[in-house]
């Protein structure tokens, strides 16, 4: 049986994906074995010991460190084992075009992984505290959105989460009020979403029309109710002293850009 060794001086995800993609092209059984953190000449010897135990073997490598990569290639050639250096050709071509030398930093990919996991964490945070009565997340949030129903709080939270920003949204309703905790956090991370009353009425009526048995004349979309809510929201935002953003004719991306600039996202 053929074995493909996915060898890397980092976690080995890239090498493993390449090996799995190659193996999937054959009906015959191909075993893929990931070997991460090959960072020294001694580690290379361990790889070769594993290779020697295989009936038939190919090595797919994403090792960046030059001396380790060359040592692996040399040892494999001595055993007549094929080595595919996945990143080498791409790095060489890019180096020529950019007219600069690569850093050969094995941890560079890990930095990208950290950004990815930060994004996932922010998304989980946004979902956990979406329109929630659990306000424990306020102190851990990067951004706190407050606004009436149908002012795009949830999609805005998710958009920010995709940037790795932990956002929580607090719905404003006259009957409920706001949690005391919101007055205890830094007001610079609180953003009040405002909207034109006619536009809000239109959005709410359209929302209700999606539910065939619910008339759009109910209080939720009524003029008096909307004006009452807007007045309540305005008083709360003034009391907090937070930045307000009119979302009437503004795309979610544009609103997010304003927030990201205010919290210094591009400077992090």
Swiss-Prot record:
GO-annotated molecular function: ADP binding; ATP binding; phosphotransferase activity, phosphate group as acceptor; protein serine/threonine kinase activity
Q: Which domain of life is it from?
A: Bacteria
Alphabetically list the UniProt keywords. Kinase, Nucleotide-binding, Serine/threonine-protein kinase, Transferase
The EC class name is: transferase
Residues the entry annotates as binding ADP: 147-154
- State the reactions this protein catalyses: N(tele)-phospho-L-histidyl/L-threonyl-[pyruvate, phosphate dikinase] + ADP = N(tele)-phospho-L-histidyl/O-phospho-L-threonyl-[pyruvate, phosphate dikinase] + AMP + H(+); N(tele)-phospho-L-histidyl/O-phospho-L-threonyl-[pyruvate, phosphate dikinase] + phosphate + H(+) = N(tele)-phospho-L-histidyl/L-threonyl-[pyruvate, phosphate dikinase] + diphosphate
Family of the protein in this entry: Belongs to the pyruvate, phosphate/water dikinase regulatory protein family. PDRP subfamily.
Question: What protein am I looking at?
Answer: Putative pyruvate, phosphate dikinase regulatory protein
Report the source organism. Answer: Clostridium beijerinckii (strain ATCC 51743 / NCIMB 8052) (Clostridium acetobutylicum)
């Amino acid at each position: 049986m053929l074995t493909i060794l996915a060898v890397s001086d980092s976690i080995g995800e890239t090498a493993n994906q390449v090996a799995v993609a190659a193996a999937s092209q054959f009906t015959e059984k191909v075993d893929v074995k990931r070997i991460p953190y090959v960072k020294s000449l001694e580690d290379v010897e361990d790889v070769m010991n594993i290779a020697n135990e295989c009936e038939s073997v190919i090595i797919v490598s994403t090792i960046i460190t030059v001396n380790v990569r060359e040592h692996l290639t040399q040892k494999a050639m001595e055993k007549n084992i094929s080595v595919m250096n996945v990143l080498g050709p791409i790095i060489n071509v890019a180096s020529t075009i950019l007219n600069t030398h690569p850093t050969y930093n094995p941890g560079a990919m890990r930095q990208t992984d950290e950004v990815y996991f930060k994004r996932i964490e922010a998304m989980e945070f946004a979902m956990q505290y979406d329109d929630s009565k659990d306000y424990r997340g306020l102190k851990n949030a990067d951004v706190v959105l407050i606004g009436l129903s149908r002012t795009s709080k949830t999609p805005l939270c998710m958009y920010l989460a995709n940037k790795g920003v932990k956002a929580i949204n607090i719905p404003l309703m006259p009957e409920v009020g706001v949690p005391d905790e919101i007055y205890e956090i830094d007001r610079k991370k609180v953003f009040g979403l405002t909207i034109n009353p006619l536009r809000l009425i239109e959005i709410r009526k359209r929302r209700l029309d999606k539910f065939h048995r619910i008339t759009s004349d109910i209080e939720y979309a009524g003029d008096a109710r909307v004006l009452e809510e807007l007045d309540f929201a305005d008083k709360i935002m003034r009391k907090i002293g937070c930045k307000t953003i009119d979302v009437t004719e503004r795309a979610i991306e544009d609103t997010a850009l304003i927030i990201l600039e205010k919290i210094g996202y591009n400077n992090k």
